[in-house]
Amino acid sequence: MSLLSRRKFIGHAGKTALAGSVIFATGPQQAGKNMKNVFIHHVYFWLKNAGSAADQDKLAEGLQKLSGVKTIRQYHIGKPAATSRDVIDTSYALSWLVVFDNDADQASYQTDPIHLKFVEDYAHLWQKVIVYDSVDR
């Protein structure tokens, strides 16, 4: 085997081993894993310019920055899925799902300078915002 071929082989083998370790590091997938002891904050945004891809991109950029608040455990920025059933509302432009460890972390987020700056810089883009907060029952 030539030196170049050997290097390619070693490089590919290393990447394959790394990919395998990532899969096993996450552990086996569990169906229906329940999130416990968390505070869910789900925000839906309707844009003033509903069809504007530029405004949607700008808001997504702002949400990405907002996701840097230290008390946020996890987040997801999404758009309506291409599903069609009577119970599904796809009229919003973007949603932002946030997981906090507790109510105190969510309360801290409300006054965090990053959150206040987000509202100041991006509020002109939306016409309506609805928030659904939930905790364990």
Enumerate the predicted regions with their spans.
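C-terminal segment of N-terminal export signals and the immediately downstream linker at the start
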Residues: 24-54
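Short, glycine- and small/hydrophobic-rich beta-strand elements in well-ordered beta-sheets
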Residues: 24-31, 64-93, 124, 131-136
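Short, well-ordered beta-strand segments in beta-rich or mixed alpha/beta enzyme
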Residues: 38-47, 78, 85-110
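Surface-exposed, polar helix/loop patches in the mature regions of secreted/periplasmic/lumenal proteins
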Residues: 99-136
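N-terminal secretory signal peptides and thylakoid transit peptides that target proteins
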Residues: 1-18
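Short amphipathic alpha-helical segments
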Residues: 51-77, 113-123
